[in-house]
Amino acid sequence: MPIITDVYAREVLDSRGNPTVEVEVLTESGAFGRALVPSGASTGEHEAVELRDGDKSRYLGKGVTKAVENVNEIIAPEIIEGEFSVLDQVSIDKMMIALDGTPNKGKLGANAILGVSIAVARAAADLLGQPLYKYLGGFNGKQLPVPMMNIVNGGSHSDAPIAFQEFMILPVGATTFKESLRWGTEIFHNLKSILSKRGLETAVGDEGGFAPKFEGTEDAVETIIQAIEAAGYKPGEEVFLGFDCASSEFYENGVYDYSKFEGEHGAKRTAAEQVDYLEQLVDKYPIITIEDGMDENDWDGWKQLTERIGDRVQLVGDDLFVTNTEILAKGIENGIGNSILIKVNQIGTLTETFDAIEMAQKAGYTAVVSHRSGETEDTTIADIAVATNAGQIKTGSLSRTDRIAKYNQLLRIEDELFETAKYDGIKSFYNLDK
């Protein structure tokens, strides 16, 4: 039977050693689902609230016992006494949103609500004897995503003196996901060798990418291109580059202040100068995607950037849109960006996550399913990417099990789909004039 009989949350640790919420859901027939909630480092100001305890004597204030209590003492009784079916995903999500009663899930915490939302979906898939991607996407979920592999970490994700937060490779020339993963891995290991020969550090950052002390942005880009070529692939044909600028992390009082991360040699740019700078990089290097190139509140700057390079570069809104359909709708109406980053914990339920993906795709925007810098062994985002035919996933570099777990899950899904599996490569960027 599909009726939920137990919902239980506990405090566990994420990949950064910080507490996070784990939720388990059980039905009367014994179907079971478990979910672990991720956490971000650079967060948009309009994100749903991640509830932390604030008790400095415990986990330096980052405990999540309040969120856990909200699941066990408020949400769980509502679900169990309401005799909700595990198949009633939308009803359960809407009930939790109403129970919270705030616009940003600040009462119960998005980390509490999301844990329940995903655990319910996993229990439903278990009840039906289906893989999660098939339960979420039906028979039509078959497209494997192009991986955006963050092989160099900067900004808030590392101690490297570079403002941009992520430097990514995208193996669009591969014919299968399995092949794309191999290409990325070979480039990653070639990059490590190049860094070692230069006497640069090969320690990795939060998302598994290297965080060496490059001389600047262009040094990082050119070194990555060197690694692509050393691995035997063609930059700009088989493998493209991408940035997550995370510009909100160094934007203040109308100025993009690179000195925050790059020291006294870091430039200070106006919005117009930031647009010019990004266009210069696009003209010079094989860049296909730029995330958060402008500050989340600099909509005029976003408009300029979109008009300037939006026909040839994917412009992804992360802090800009925060997986929120109200903000995304405004962006679509005003021609801001051409893609949305999808982070389940930015909005807090699977229902709202799927609504955002659907809205983007209907408007001709791409949707890039993404991890957070604080991750776990949970692989739900891999299943979401396939279920929604998103075509792109961003889940870190080629090291750290919290990142590799998602890649391995995609390998399993591709195997299960067998001949129906698709990997569209460059065609996944349907928002560009290619």
From Swiss-Prot:
<dbReference type="GO" id="GO:0006096">
    <property type="term" value="P:glycolytic process"/>
</dbReference>
<feature type="active site" description="Proton acceptor">
    <location>
        <position position="343"/>
    </location>
</feature>
<keyword id="KW-0324">Glycolysis</keyword>
<keyword id="KW-0963">Cytoplasm</keyword>
<feature type="binding site">
    <location>
        <position position="165"/>
    </location>
    <ligand>
        <name>(2R)-2-phosphoglycerate</name>
    </ligand>
</feature>
<keyword id="KW-0843">Virulence</keyword>
<dbReference type="GO" id="GO:0004634">
    <property type="term" value="F:phosphopyruvate hydratase activity"/>
</dbReference>
<keyword id="KW-0479">Metal-binding</keyword>
<dbReference type="GO" id="GO:0005576">
    <property type="term" value="C:extracellular region"/>
</dbReference>
<dbReference type="GO" id="GO:0000015">
    <property type="term" value="C:phosphopyruvate hydratase complex"/>
</dbReference>
<dbReference type="InterPro" id="IPR029017">
    <property type="entry name" value="Enolase-like_N"/>
</dbReference>
<dbReference type="GO" id="GO:0005518">
    <property type="term" value="F:collagen binding"/>
</dbReference>
<feature type="binding site">
    <location>
        <position position="373"/>
    </location>
    <ligand>
        <name>(2R)-2-phosphoglycerate</name>
    </ligand>
</feature>
<dbReference type="InterPro" id="IPR036849">
    <property type="entry name" value="Enolase-like_C_sf"/>
</dbReference>
<comment type="pathway">
    <text>Carbohydrate degradation; glycolysis; pyruvate from D-glyceraldehyde 3-phosphate: step 4/5.</text>
</comment>
<dbReference type="Pfam" id="PF03952">
    <property type="entry name" value="Enolase_N"/>
</dbReference>
<dbReference type="InterPro" id="IPR000941">
    <property type="entry name" value="Enolase"/>
</dbReference>
<comment type="function">
    <text>Probably part of the RNA degradosome.</text>
</comment>
<feature type="binding site">
    <location>
        <position position="343"/>
    </location>
    <ligand>
        <name>(2R)-2-phosphoglycerate</name>
    </ligand>
</feature>
<dbReference type="InterPro" id="IPR020809">
    <property type="entry name" value="Enolase_CS"/>
</dbReference>
<feature type="active site" description="Proton donor">
    <location>
        <position position="207"/>
    </location>
</feature>
<dbReference type="GO" id="GO:0009986">
    <property type="term" value="C:cell surface"/>
</dbReference>
<feature type="binding site">
    <location>
        <position position="244"/>
    </location>
    <ligand>
        <name>Mg(2+)</name>
    </ligand>
</feature>
<protein>
    <recommendedName>
        <fullName>Enolase</fullName>
        <ecNumber>4.2.1.11</ecNumber>
    </recommendedName>
</protein>
<dbReference type="GO" id="GO:0000287">
    <property type="term" value="F:magnesium ion binding"/>
</dbReference>
<feature type="binding site">
    <location>
        <position position="394"/>
    </location>
    <ligand>
        <name>(2R)-2-phosphoglycerate</name>
    </ligand>
</feature>
<keyword id="KW-0964">Secreted</keyword>
<feature type="binding site">
    <location>
        <position position="291"/>
    </location>
    <ligand>
        <name>Mg(2+)</name>
    </ligand>
</feature>
<comment type="subunit">
    <text>Homodimer. Component of a possible RNA degradosome complex composed of cshA, eno, pfkA, pnp, rnjA, rnjB, rnpA and rny. Interacts specifically with RNA helicase CshA, PNPase and RNase Y.</text>
</comment>
<dbReference type="InterPro" id="IPR020810">
    <property type="entry name" value="Enolase_C"/>
</dbReference>
<dbReference type="Pfam" id="PF00113">
    <property type="entry name" value="Enolase_C"/>
</dbReference>
<dbReference type="GO" id="GO:0043236">
    <property type="term" value="F:laminin binding"/>
</dbReference>
<keyword id="KW-0456">Lyase</keyword>
<feature type="binding site">
    <location>
        <position position="372"/>
    </location>
    <ligand>
        <name>(2R)-2-phosphoglycerate</name>
    </ligand>
</feature>
<feature type="binding site">
    <location>
        <position position="318"/>
    </location>
    <ligand>
        <name>Mg(2+)</name>
    </ligand>
</feature>
<comment type="function">
    <text>Catalyzes the reversible conversion of 2-phosphoglycerate (2-PG) into phosphoenolpyruvate (PEP). It is essential for the degradation of carbohydrates via glycolysis.</text>
</comment>
<dbReference type="InterPro" id="IPR020811">
    <property type="entry name" value="Enolase_N"/>
</dbReference>
<comment type="similarity">
    <text>Belongs to the enolase family.</text>
</comment>
<keyword id="KW-0460">Magnesium</keyword>
